[in-house]
Amino acid sequence: MAEGAYPASWYAATRDAAPDRPQLAGQTEADIAVVGGGFAGLHTARLLAQQGQRVVLVERHRIAWGASGRNGGFVGPGYAARSGLLIDKLGLDHSRRLYAQSQVGVEIVRQAIEAFGRPDILMGSRKLVASRTDQGADFADRTRRLAEQLGARFEPWSTAETREKLDTARYFQSIHDPTSFHIHPLNFALALAADIERLGGRLHEGTEATALDRKGDRWLLRTSQGAVIARHVVLAGSATLGQVHGRLSRAVLPVATYVAVTEKIGPDLGAAIRWSGAISDTRRAGDYYRVVDGDRLLWGGRITTDTSEPPRLREMMRGDIVSVYPQLRDIRIAYAWPGIMGYAPHKMPQIGEIEPGLWICSAFGGHGLAQTAAGADAVTAGILGDPSKARLFSPFGTDWAGGPIGRAAAQLVYWQLQASDWWDEKREARNAERLRT
Ligand SMILES: Cc1cc2nc3c(=O)[nH]c(=O)nc-3n(C[C@H](O)[C@H](O)[C@H](O)COP(=O)(O)OP(=O)(O)OC[C@H]3O[C@@H](n4cnc5c(N)ncnc54)[C@H](O)[C@@H]3O)c2cc1C
């Protein structure tokens, strides 16, 4: 039986009932073995099972026990690495094809929710990304140009349009994406798992993959109490992959971020946030939030490489909310929880075949809900003989993220990013002051 319950969260409190899946005991055979029961592993297993492949998935804890069951729930195109940087590095054509692959991921998620007949999993449509600094007169032109270059459908909103929806002086212009939406991620993961089983796939919880050996033209994946012999193995364990593949596990950096859900707020919330879509800001370590359950605020934010839970997490999150919406000063936090994202140093996912029959689908950072589906689609196509989608990701290797030393270095980088957010805002406040006097 699977170990433990889900960690306490609003998602766990509102989740669907799901069976405990048995541990893998003894040796079994499959076409494909998947390590990790988060969205990367679940989408991969489902897409392959849809193609008639015999799939076995092993998960150390429970389905979507990691980031996939605890995140902000935003589904949208793009990647954790900024599009402008991708264009500089790869050129326009390649960046456009990468963006298109992320749009494929969005569609896979949308179509799966439709196919499951679960409209309640889809909790709202559209997204606003608001700037905390004035972006100047050319913001609209720059935004439209970037959208055109990428083949994207996002569009600029002025400061007045933004503040009409979000009653805070913190925000200036924003980017409106009509193609994004937001979901109940844990229930979506549980629905994916049920669908894999309907398609004949086998899921094992409480089962850690511990070692991997070549056996002729197949792989032997050893687990805590058993083993799988398979032609292909897909490693989708993100930042907690562990000893099953030491090099790949070191190539993904664990970065913590936090989510809180308030108690029910009443009409004050609707007065402050007149928008049922998702919201985030443009900072490197920004806030992301949405209204759930009618009048609760689900608020995510902060990043750190310290993966332990801070003792005063609820107060920290409440302070973050009130700093943007001072009119909500009386709110109370009902749930707060941490989650671990997996980042590669280049901030792009690691997707592809690293040895014959050994695949990776990992390192989705803070942009994983659609991108895991995009990655799974690329890996599935690769396993079935078309490597072109996986090749899109080949410039982003599985370089070393550095273990404890790399983590300290990454923490310094994050502090620098947060400092530059702070300087941007300070400069903005000084400019505003100058205009007033
Ligand atoms: C708090 C938070 C908020 C976020 N908000 C958003 C958001 O709003 N939108 C968005 O797009 N992204 C968001 N993200 C990122 C997104 O959740 C992740 O990118 C995505 O869920 C990653 O999926 P995954 O399957 O790669 O990893 P995970 O969900 O972490 O799954 C990996 C699984 O593999 C298992 N595993 C690892 N190693 C082994 C092993 N050796 N044997 C067996 N099992 C193993 C783990 O137990 C785990 O369950 C957020 C992340 C967090 C933490």
Label every model-predicted segment.
Residues T307-E309, R314-R430:
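C-terminal catalytic lobe of FAD-dependent flavoproteins
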Residues Q50-R70:
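Glycine-rich FAD pyrophosphate-binding loop
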Residues G78-A160:
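Dinucleotide-binding Rossmann-like beta1-alpha1 core, especially the glycine-rich loop
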Residues D138, R145, F172-R231:
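Helical element adjacent to the flavin cofactor pocket in flavoenzyme catalytic cores
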Residues M1-I32:
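Extreme N-terminal leader/targeting segments of oxidoreductases
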Residues E107, A115-M123, A209-A211, A227-P267, ...:
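Active-site substrate-recognition segment that forms the wall
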Residues L92, P119-V129, E161-D195, L199, ...:
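Helix-loop-beta segment of a Rossmann-like dinucleotide-binding subdomain
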Residues A30-L57:
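N-terminal Rossmann-like FAD-binding beta1-loop-alpha1 element of flavoenzymes
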